């Protein structure tokens, strides 16, 4: 759940606060939830809220444009929280964050890219008891009427998947990742994606 530095509660945050009998407002007033960019706070099983775990991620000053670097910090915190939840399904509620010289489609695309890229895990063959990423489904709720955001999210996921593919090749041992192996991977990509 995205939280700005403003101490006022509105939108989804107000609904969650009312459902929790004022818990969120108390935590904000005690500055346990600050809203500072990238700051993340974990709360287990908030009374009145139908979620096993909740993470509050700071989005900075309300109604103020932020830099791309700050937005990347927010996306990284959201992605880290989603994976740390160890849940199969995650709901992300974020306010519309305004980034300098960027539109809403770009912000959604970057979030999709971070979520996908952060899910990467390298599995070394032969090593037992390797941790597995259990996250299978992510739903994003955003207060925006802009059209085409699902396409922007999909684009971000595709870029993130490409990044993960590159990481997998880079992490493959040199005795396996030979020129022949790379050529086979390239051929497989061209068979799967006609534009490659």
Regions found by a protein language model. Name each.
Residues 1-196:
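Short amphipathic alpha-helical segment within the helicase RecA-like ATPase core
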């Amino acid at each position: 759940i995205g939280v700005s530095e403003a101490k006022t509660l509105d939108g989804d945050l107000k609904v969650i606060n009312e459902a929790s009998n004022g818990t969120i407002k108390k935590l904000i007033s005690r500055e346990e939830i600050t809203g500072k960019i990238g700051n993340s706070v974990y709360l287990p099983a908030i009374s009145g809220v139908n979620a096993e775990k909740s993470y509050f991620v700071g989005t900075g000053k309300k109604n103020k444009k932020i830099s791309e670097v700050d937005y990347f910090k927010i996306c990284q915190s959201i992605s880290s929280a989603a994976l740390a939840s160890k849940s199969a399904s995650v709901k992300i509620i974020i306010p519309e964050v305004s980034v300098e010289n960027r539109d809403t489609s770009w912000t959604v695309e970057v979030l999709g890219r971070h979520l996908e890229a952060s899910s990467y895990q390298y599995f070394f063959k032969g090593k037992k008891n390797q941790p597995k990423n259990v996250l299978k489904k992510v739903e994003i709720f955003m207060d925006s009427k802009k059209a085409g955001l699902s396409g922007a999210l999909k684009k971000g996921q595709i870029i993130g998947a490409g990044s993960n593919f590159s990481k997998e090749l880079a992490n493959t041992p040199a005795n396996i990742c030979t020129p022949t192996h790379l050529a086979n991977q390239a051929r497989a990509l061209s068979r799967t994606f006609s534009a490659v």
